[in-house]
């Protein structure tokens, strides 16, 4: 049974944390350490944590001397091939401070749609968690086609949350919560709670992602609904507030799960 309300966040036994490209690459690469600090704190109190991390393409771009996200698939795949190894190294370097070992898991949404692939992924994930390791999941951008162009790791995170029967899905971004309209616009109101089945009528959800990522508010709301439908509580907040979020502080937007 998932976490039914905010009150249960601090005691959630199994947590999926999703972080986006713009939060941990480029000038924000330094945010990996505080993200790991928060995950390690949850791990230390007994929680099992899965990290779904975007960022392979964005991390690889400087090594290919690219200032902007490449438009063509082959260059995206090349950037991902370089960036994924650098990204996992950075995570492990930070995790070493806590004696936690990362296990890299590369998936596509299609992998989780095929029953045999899904079963294999589930078995591997359960074993990693049982060994008290940290599965670090990313979309397999080097071989993905449709997903690399139009997919997003928000949806992948929701599917992973369903795969491991997570109590909590924590969706991290550059914005601290869901707002009634783009937060930079006058009159934007922070939404603290979304009841299960709420269609969010009157809420203007922009679809534009960042320059290095593919997600935005639309993908996060869709992912939150997908996870909530399966009984997983979802909290949407900023990467800067990850420690407070995992400690149960009243931050972000809570999506109540199906009861």
Curated annotation (Swiss-Prot):
In which domain of life is the source organism classified?
A: Bacteria
Q: What class of enzyme is it?
A: transferase
As recorded in UniProt, coiled-coil segments are none
Tell me which GO cellular component terms the UniProt record holds: cytosol
Sorted alphabetically, which keywords does the UniProt record give? Amino-acid biosynthesis, ATP-binding, Cytoplasm, Kinase, Nucleotide-binding, Proline biosynthesis, Transferase
InterPro entries referenced in this protein's UniProt entry, alphabetically:
AceGlu_kinase-like_sf, Asp/Glu/Uridylate_kinase, Glu/AcGlu_kinase, Glu_5kinase, Glu_5kinase/COase_Synthase
The Enzyme Commission number assigned here is 2.7.2.11
Q: Name one GO molecular function term.
A: ATP binding
Where does the protein principally reside?
cytoplasm
The residues listed in the UniProt record as binding ATP, with positions renumbered to this chain, are 18, 173-174
Localization annotation: Cytoplasm
Quote the record's binding site residues for substrate. Answer: 54, 141, 153
- Write down the chemical reaction(s) this protein catalyses: L-glutamate + ATP = L-glutamyl 5-phosphate + ADP
Q: In which pathway does it act?
A: Amino-acid biosynthesis; L-proline biosynthesis; L-glutamate 5-semialdehyde from L-glutamate: step 1/2
Matching entries from Pfam families are given as:
AA_kinase (PF00696)
Its function, per the record, reads: Catalyzes the transfer of a phosphate group to glutamate to form L-glutamate 5-phosphate.
Q: Which HAMAP family match?
A: ProB (MF_00456)
Protein name per Swiss-Prot or TrEMBL: Glutamate 5-kinase
Which species is the source of this protein? Clavibacter sepedonicus (Clavibacter michiganensis subsp. sepedonicus)
**Gene name of the record:** proB
């Amino acid at each position: 049974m998932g976490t039914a309300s905010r009150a249960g966040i601090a005691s959630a036994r199994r947590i999926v944390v999703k972080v986006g490209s713009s939060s941990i690459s480029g000038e924000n690469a330094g945010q990996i350490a505080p993200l790991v600090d928060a995950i390690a704190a949850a791990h230390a109190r007994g929680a099992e944590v899965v990290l779904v991390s975007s960022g392979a393409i964005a991390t690889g771009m400087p090594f290919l001397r690219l200032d902007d996200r490449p438009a063509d698939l082959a260059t995206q795949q090349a950037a991902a091939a370089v960036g994924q190894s650098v990204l996992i190294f950075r995570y492990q370097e930070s995790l070493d401070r806590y004696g936690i070992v990362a296990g890299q898991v590369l998936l596509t949404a299609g992998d989780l749609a095929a029953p045999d692939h899904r079963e294999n992924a589930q078995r591997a994930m359960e074993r990693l968690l049982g060994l008290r390791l940290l599965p670090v999941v990313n979309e397999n951008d080097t071989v993905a086609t449709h997903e690399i162009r139009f997919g997003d790791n928000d949806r992948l995170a929701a599917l992973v949350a369903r795969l491991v029967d997570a109590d909590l899905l924590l969706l991290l971004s550059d914005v601290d919560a869901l707002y009634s309209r783009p937060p930079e616009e006058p009159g934007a109101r922070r939404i603290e709670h979304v009841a299960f089945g709420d269609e969010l009528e009157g809420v203007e959800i922009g679809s534009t992602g960042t320059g290095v990522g593919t997600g935005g508010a639309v993908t996060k709301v869709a992912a939150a609904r997908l996870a909530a439908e399966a009984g997983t509580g979802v909290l949407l907040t900023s990467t800067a507030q990850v420690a407070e979020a995992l400690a149960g502080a009243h931050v972000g937007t809570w999506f109540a799960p199906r009861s």
